[in-house]
Amino acid sequence: MAKSNYVFIHLLLYCVGLSYAQSSYTSNTIIRNKVALTYTSQIGVRELTGNNDGKAVETYLRYCDLPKGEPWCASFVCWVYGKNNVTNPRSGFCPDLFQQKNTVWTRNSNHNITPTRADIFGIYFPNKKRIAHTGFIDKWTSTQVHTVEGNTNQAGSREGDGVYRKIRLTRQIYAVARFIK
């Protein structure tokens, strides 16, 4: 009798564990999809005068307690996460989004986790000696990254005029961070 109870308890714990793992996976997928819906809904937002301003841009900046006129790519990322109750640093400073605990991929590393939808990318600028542009990954391949990013333009500038869908080369990406875990 004791042996059958022991087997039953282990079987029950195994099933509960599978159920928990599956619900965690499903929950993350739902959150990623909601985040993606939010960032894609912003494609087409443009600055009012080309000076980091306009109703939507100022909303992104306010989320991070920044005034009109500040660069806003990181604020856009934080605002989107915030709209979906994803914990984030609420910062307009790109390096704040790439703390080691959140970084899952870095250029030239052998220990990378494959980036996925709703992760964020960072581009390093040697003249600034830091990551100075960020946005969302919508699709990742070995050679290309489909993105949605704020404060860019058709040419891919880090000081742009709106929210755009872009295709970047994977080799342009310096780091990837994951906030949906």
Give a label for each model feature.
Residues 13-21:
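Hydrophobic h-region of N-terminal signal peptides that target proteins for export
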Residues 30-37, 86-155:
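...with weaker cross-activation on analogous glycine-rich loops/strands in unrelated enzymes
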Residues 20-87, 180:
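N-terminal capping segments
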Residues 57, 97, 163:
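Short clusters of hydrophobic/aromatic residues that line enzyme substrate/ligand-binding pockets
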Residues 1-9:
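Bacterial N-terminal signal peptides that target proteins for export
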Residues 53-54, 93, 169:
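Helix N-terminus capping/helix-initiation residues
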Residues 143-181:
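Active-site signature of cysteine proteases
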